[in-house]
C-alpha cells in the first residue's frame, strides 16, 4: 500500500505482462492451467503461487518494492484518496508494511529471479537496490536502504558479484516459457 507497485507496473511491466491478475486464487489457477504469462500485484509475496508456477514450467520473477518508512506510504495513500482514489484503513499500513518486508527473504527461496527496488522519495524514483537469482545475492547497490540492511544484514556487505550499482526496472509476476 503506497510503495509504488502500480506505478512501476504501469511504467515498466504492463507491455510485457498486460494480464494483471488480482489476488484471487481461481484467476491465478486459471492462468496457470492455460499457460498464460501474467503479473500479480499483492502486498506480500505468495510463495505457494511461485511454487505452483514453477511446477507448471514457468520461470518466476518477483519485483519487490518498498520504502524506508510506512509513514511515506500513508502520505502517498492520503494524496491518492484526496484525488478520488481508493479509500484504505490507514491504521493497517504499518502492519502491512512489516508483513511485506518479512515476505522478501522467503520470496528469494521460491523465485527464479528477485529484483528489489527502493521507492523512498529522494528524487530517484524506483531504484534497483538488490537482485537475487536462484536465491543467491548477485547484485547489491553500494548505498543499500536501511530496510534492506535490516532484512539481509551482513550478506549485503561485499557480496555483490556482478557490479556495484544495478540499473533497471510490492510486483511479483510469473512468466511462462
Kindly give the residue locations of the regions a language model identified.
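Acidic, metal-coordinating catalytic cores used for nucleic-acid/nucleotide bond scission
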Residues: 39-49, 67
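Anion (oxyanion) recognition and catalysis
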Residues: 32-33, 54-56, 108
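Catalytic-core regions built around general acid/base machinery
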Residues: 27, 49-56
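Conserved substrate/cofactor phosphate-moiety recognition/catalytic segment
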Residues: 3-40
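Positively charged, amphipathic and often flexible ligand-engagement surfaces
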Residues: 10, 56-59, 99
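Conserved GTP-binding G-domain of TRAFAC-class P-loop NTPases and closely related GTPase folds
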Residues: 79-173
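Conserved phosphate-donor/acceptor-positioning beta-strand/loop module used by diverse small-molecule
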Residues: 56-77
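Hydrophobic anchor at the start of a short beta-strand
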Residues: 38, 57-61, 114
Amino acid at each position: 500500500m503506497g510503495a509504488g507497485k502500480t506505478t512501476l507496473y504501469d511504467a515498466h511491466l504492463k507491455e510485457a505482462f498486460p494480464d494483471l491478475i488480482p489476488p484471487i486464487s481461481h484467476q491465478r489457477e486459471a492462468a496457470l492451467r492455460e499457460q498464460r504469462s501474467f503479473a500479480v500485484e499483492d502486498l506480500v509475496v505468495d510463495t505457494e503461487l511461485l511454487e505452483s508456477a514453477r511446477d507448471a514450467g514457468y520461470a518466476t520473477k518477483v519485483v519487490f518494492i518498498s520504502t524506508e518508512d510506512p509513514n511515506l506510504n500513508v502520505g502517498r495513500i492520503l494524496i491518492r484518496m484526496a484525488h478520488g482514489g481508493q479509500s484504505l484503513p490507514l491504521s493497517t499500513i504499518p502492519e502491512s508494511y512489516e508483513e511485506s518486508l518479512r515476505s522478501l527473504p522467503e520470496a528469494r527461496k521460491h523465485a527464479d529471479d528477485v529484483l528489489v527496488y527502493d521507492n523512498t522519495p529522494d528524487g530517484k524514483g524506483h531504484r534497483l537496490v538488490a537482485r537475487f537469482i536462484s536465491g543467491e545475492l548477485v547484485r547489491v547497490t553500494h548505498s543499500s536502504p536501511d530496510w534492506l540492511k535490516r532484512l539481509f544484514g551482513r550478506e549485503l556487505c561485499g557480496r555483490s558479484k556482478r557490479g556495484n550499482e544495478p540499473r533497471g526496472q510490492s510486483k511479483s509476476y510469473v512468466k511462462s516459457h
